[in-house]
Amino acid sequence: MSKNYLFTSESVSEGHPDKLADQISDAILDEILKQDKNARVACETLVKTGMALVAGEITTSAWVDIEELVRNVITETGYDNASKGIDGRTCSVINAIGKQSRDITQGVDRGSLEDLGAGDQGLMFGFATNETPTLMPSAIYYSHLLMRKQAELRKSGKLAWLRPDAKAQVTLAYENDKPKFIDTIVLSTQHNESISQKELHDAVIEEIVKKVIPNELITKDTKYHINPTGVFLIGGPQGDCGLTGRKIIVDTYGGAAHHGGGAFSGKDPSKVDRSGAYMGRYIAKNIVAAGLADKCEVQVAYAIGVAKPVSLMVNTFGTGKITDNQIEKLVAEVFDLRVGKIIENLDLLRPIYRKTSNYGHFGRELPEFTWEKIDKADILKSAARI
């Protein structure tokens, strides 16, 4: 890639149908983990007009009222009237959950957490860059801020015409590989019939965009596309079918890094799609926080039933203060990449996952998000002797 370029990422609101599905899957996971930390959960959700279908494989001693939980998530997300796309109080809830295959169970469970085998094969990536305060890429960072502001204004009632479904997209102009200004902002939000297009356009610019985007990133040439189709009345599951795991780029780095292909929501942490990706972020963030590189991507891969990873790779894109191979050796010394130790060290057997399902799994420094800590940075810096 040239040193001067445009780069774009998107985010979606918690009322986007795919995100509604993610929230349901993670809410079910959370409720099970409250009762049974040894549960095996792979929960998928589909939402469409007037219905929610929950399916997957769950092995647990816990009892969860799936129907009530699904209804609560839908209404809490703002879908409490059929005119919005679905009504959690009256929609149909279909439960098609089965148990995990015994063949998988015998290959994964080892008695002790330390010896736990990976729940499946797969490759995962972690990433960090010093572009933003949370060490996230700029385009996804600002896209998430726009969507969080939209939700805040909707929930507070300040913009009473807002409805739950929305999307944002930010295009950053880079010069010499550094973000310089925002070239384009796209924001589409569902609304009711009381607002005109001009009023909506002006309110979104003044109350959402200008409240979260730094002035220094906006130029006279910055382009705005606010509800560019003109009307966004039909949204949520009525407008589009929603499925768990359909927003994996929104969940991660907005396309600024590789992705191993595995989704997160609805999966307990024995599934390395989730725990391996969280560990990758933890490693990459600590490398950048330590000053070992300006930008870092980590790949880790696992075999089903095997505790240790089959591979580890570090790429600093030429920004490393020491070689990538040297950083890899430090990572192997400082971080325990066995699946059970990842779960233990990041304290992943807690009911924290519904919070992860909106506005990205990475870059939000909440107490529950242990993979966002930079507690290994000083250790890495000292070991690297920089």
UniProtKB/Swiss-Prot annotation:
Binding site for ATP: 16, 165-167, 240, 246-247, 263, 267
InterPro entries linked: ADOMET_SYNTHASE_CS, S-AdoMet_synt_C, S-AdoMet_synt_central, S-AdoMet_synt_N, S-AdoMet_synthetase, S-AdoMet_synthetase_sfam
Positions of disulphide bridges: none
Localization (cell): Cytoplasm
Pathway: Amino-acid biosynthesis; S-adenosyl-L-methionine biosynthesis; S-adenosyl-L-methionine from L-methionine: step 1/1
UniProt EC number: 2.5.1.6
Molecular-function GO term, any one: methionine adenosyltransferase activity
Region (Flexible loop): 100-110
Entry binding sites for K(+): 44
Residues where Mg(2+) binds: 18
GO terms (BP aspect): one-carbon metabolic process; S-adenosylmethionine biosynthetic process
Transmembrane segments: none
An example Gene Ontology CC term for this record: cytoplasm
Residue numbers binding L-methionine: 57, 100, 240, 271
Catalytic activity of the protein: L-methionine + ATP + H2O = S-adenosyl-L-methionine + phosphate + diphosphate
Subunit composition and interactions: Homotetramer; dimer of dimers.
Function, as annotated: Catalyzes the formation of S-adenosylmethionine (AdoMet) from methionine and ATP. The overall synthetic reaction is composed of two sequential steps, AdoMet formation and the subsequent tripolyphosphate hydrolysis which occurs prior to release of AdoMet from the enzyme.
Protein's UniProt name: S-adenosylmethionine synthase
Organism: Francisella tularensis subsp. tularensis (strain SCHU S4 / Schu 4)
